[in-house]
Amino acid sequence: MRLNPGEIVRVLETKISDYKEEIRLEDTGKVIQVGDGIARVYGLNNVMANEMVEFVETGTKGLAFNLEEDNVGIIILGDYKDIKEGHTVRRLNRIMEVPVGEGLLGRVVNPLGEPLDGLGPVEYKETRPIEFKAPGVIFRKPVDTPLQTGLKVVDSLIPIGRGQRELIIGDRQTGKTAIAIDTIINQKGKGVYCIYVAIGQKASAVARIVEKLRQTGAMEYTTVVVAASSDPATLQYIAPYAGCAMGEYFMFNGKDALVVYDDLSKHAVAYRQISLLLRRPPGREAYPGDVFYLHSRLLERAARLNEKYGGGSLTALPIIETQANDISAYIPTNVISITDGQIYLEPGLFYAGQRPAVNIGLSVSRVGGAAQIKAMKQVAGSLKLDLAQFQELETFAQFATELDPATQAQITRGQRLMELMKQPQYSPMEVEDQVVVLFAGINGYLDDLPINAVKAFEEGLLKFVKEKYSSLLDEIRTTKQLSKENETKLHAVIKEFKEEFVKLYGK
């Protein structure tokens, strides 16, 4: 084989001309202490607050949290067991971001956007920072569109609007998560994308919820973000912000999104743990001084944008667990003051069989009334006051031997209306069905029925109306109001059904 000197020269010249010397400066530091999900690092002098860093030897990511004079306190996002003293940490020159978009629908992911459901990698085209400034007053418009939960007691008495923040608060095992899951199930076909964020929940409980969402077809428009109780406090801390970023993607693209934070009590506990480990000074109940800001900066990101900015919305349903009904504790009062109302669930009502166990007197929606459809306003206008008065009268009636007819009539109707408010789990109702049922209740059609016949009457009435007068339901759905003509028609329909019902069941 003869070597051509000219050819060799040409190849060498090409290689030399293509050679580009690249000098890259990397800001690195050394781990001086590690444990409990926290690393102290020396040498990262130029690191930004909340900047992502990487532990070179293990590939684990971290978040620069405490910037001190001689070292940086880093919260480790993942397993810290393999990180040792002396390991190298390098800056990534970006703040923390998570994948967003429609590719996450139907998936179960951790707060970093990594899949947990075994369905392969998550497909995404965009990422968003987990911390983002809440939209200002100029970007917003008043809440004016309802977000139907499918629960009679909520949609009639404590209505929620798109863009609202409504707190669900109560003791453990009172049905807080059930209300949130029913709301997600009820968004089917309504163009609302849902994000369910599980913070510090048992993995088995989350698996049950995911399975229920799959069975009802709700996973098609839902993303589940999980930081289970077995995950480090650092992941539990960032979970709600990651879920919020995923919801914001839809809001800023002119769509409607709903995000459930289940629950923020455990989130505050995780933040307290991180803060104490980083030697931040403790305050009331050992929470750090900025625990109010922790939740306010998260919940303020829920908004209804005006048309100029796309008209999208992000509705937030934070959940808070109380201890022994104490809603005046530190975290509950903080979140009550941040949100636009609360749904208060009471163990006493729950164990008495009143489910959802909503305490109507203590629950309120500060902005949702404007979003309620006219038909529901017409039907449920005085319902909250009537039921609150009934509960007082019922307490008083326990001590009275004789009651005047007017008081007795009010108690009779109140008992039947309370029975009407009961609803089994995972069976949300369409708003037009709710209007028909509540119309029958407030107009006294149930007053002469025994309480145990109310459920059968409700089911029978809906079946009867759907079979024979479905056009009436269609009209309520499309016009969103009860015209005088439809009111008269509804009276006639209910009377017709009641005659049949009494014949079948007797009084």
Curated annotation (Swiss-Prot):
Gene3D superfamilies: 2.40.30.20, ATP synthase alpha/beta chain, C-terminal domain, P-loop containing nucleotide triphosphate hydrolases. It is found in: Cell inner membrane. CDD domains: ATP-synt_F1_alpha_C, ATP-synt_F1_alpha_N, F1-ATPase_alpha_CD. Keywords: ATP synthesis, ATP-binding, Cell inner membrane, Cell membrane, CF(1), Hydrogen ion transport, Ion transport, Membrane, Nucleotide-binding, Translocase, Transport. The gene is atpA. GO terms for cellular component: plasma membrane; proton-transporting ATP synthase complex. PANTHER family: ATP SYNTHASE SUBUNIT ALPHA, MITOCHONDRIAL. Its EC number is 7.1.2.2. ATP binds at G170, D171, R172, Q173, T174, G175, K176, T177. One of its GO terms (molecular function) is proton-transporting ATP synthase activity, rotational mechanism. This is ATP synthase subunit alpha. F-type ATPases have 2 components, CF(1) - the catalytic core - and CF(0) - the membrane proton channel. CF(1) has five subunits: alpha(3), beta(3), gamma(1), delta(1), epsilon(1). CF(0) has three main subunits: a(1), b(2) and c(9-12). The alpha and beta chains form an alternating ring which encloses part of the gamma chain. CF(1) is attached to CF(0) by a central stalk formed by the gamma and epsilon chains, while a peripheral stalk is formed by the delta and b chains. It is an enzyme of class 7 (translocase). Its main location: membrane. It is a peripheral membrane protein. Pfam families: ATP-synt_ab, ATP-synt_ab_C, ATP-synt_ab_N. The record marks S363 as: Required for activity.
